[in-house]
Amino acid sequence: MVDKVEPFWKKNIHTREIPEGKIKFDIIIVGGGPAGCASACYAAKEGYKVLLLEKDEYPRDKICGDAVGGKALKHLEELKILDTLKKSPHYVFDSVLFSNTKNEEVCIKINDPNAVGYVYPRINFDWILFNEATKRIENNEGYVIQNFRVKNILIDKQENNRIIGIKGTKEDKEYEFLAPLTIGAGGVNCPISKAIITDIYKESFIEKKHWSSAFRQYWKNVKNINYEKGAIEFHYIDGVIPGYFWIFPIGENTCNVGLGITLDDLKNKEKKLKELQNYIITEKFATRFEDASLIENSGKSWQLPLGSPRRTKLKLRRMFGNGCLLVGDSASLVDPFTGEGIGNALLSAKIAIKHYKQNENNFNLECGEKYQKEIWDLLGKELSNSFKIQKYTRKKWLINWFIGKAKRKPELQKILSESLTSKEAQRQLTSPWILFKNLVF
């Protein structure tokens, strides 16, 4: 009898012993998810000595919709990680299915073969990124510390509130680390982003219309799904709009099933997320779930800081301080329409290291402002269009009309297909005249 081999993503990731004394690094990265690992890989590529701090210990799960779009895959290929990812279980999606409250469906094909996406369970996706980051950091004389709790952000008030490092603990032992740049990559509740936004600049950390709440479960044997390759699904349902319900296959007869809605809208719902999900599965989608089984303890909720534009000089939520940058969810860069955040997380990691390389001798507020401006220049149109589409989906009559028309009108399907990969097509999709022309005539 052959022993069953334990999947690699369930194994521990071993790191070097923690250095004693006050060691100075080139860059401290707080957070070992995709944004932090990508930042570390880009930094190691430039030869920087990096300290990566992660509050949990791998293997660990991360609550997410699990979709990884074409933008993220391009960065992973650039970092030479994509081939490793392809060897782990995943689902390839080449289309997106939308349905409305009238049960009308339209399936939009992604015609660009380079833009197809994957659905990866985050437990193995993040493991691969963290393992790669660990190897590259340690090869460059850097360190990775798991189970580390950041307790204090070290701020030099005489140097215009410059962040110079962090203090924290591991197993009740205190440590202090210094670096000319600290990168906040700790997700929605990143201590670095809270220090910058709340403590130093006294700005709003949570803005309910720019903040989404989501709930996820894993189910086996949901009906009407090709578990090898096909569509991810977005469903607009009475009682859930302006939120949406999703079904994302991940392979091996398993789906990531969940729903998301902004905090501003959730407060008006009688049911909370878990109750809403139960209502959808047992009443609206009962036939598709009649033979399905819920994976025990997989139901979890989380929050997403959205990259919807603000009416401020910075356009987006602040993502820099003196001697400090924010990346990924810590920088509030989640797509306002789809809820996908990994692509923008990896992009922001690359841009952060690029700006540090240009100003490594004196990374000040002006450098941080240039970083945020470049992020806006690269993502502003895309995020603005996504925010407009999110606002359109708040109107049930418009969703029903739009999906009904798209089902019958090839020209509208073409715009939708191109909008999945093209900024110009996204602009067309949010143009009132083009929408009016396609919907009415």
Which stretches of residues belong to each language-model region?
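Extreme N-terminal leader/targeting segments of oxidoreductases
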Residues: 1-27, 42-48
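Glycine-rich FAD pyrophosphate-binding loop
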Residues: 28, 44-64
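Glycine-rich Rossmann-fold phosphate-binding loop(s) that bind the pyrophosphate
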Residues: 31-33
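Conserved N-terminal glycine-rich FAD pyrophosphate-binding loop of Rossmann-like flavoproteins
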Residues: 57-77
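A conserved beta-strand/loop capping segment in the N-terminal third of enzymes
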Residues: 71-73, 77-127
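Predominantly flavin-linked oxidoreductase catalytic cores and closely associated redox partners
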Residues: 132-291
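FAD/FMN-dependent oxidoreductases across multiple families
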Residues: 265-356, 361-363
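C-terminal helical "tail/cap" subdomain of flavin- and related membrane-associated enzymes
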Residues: 354-441
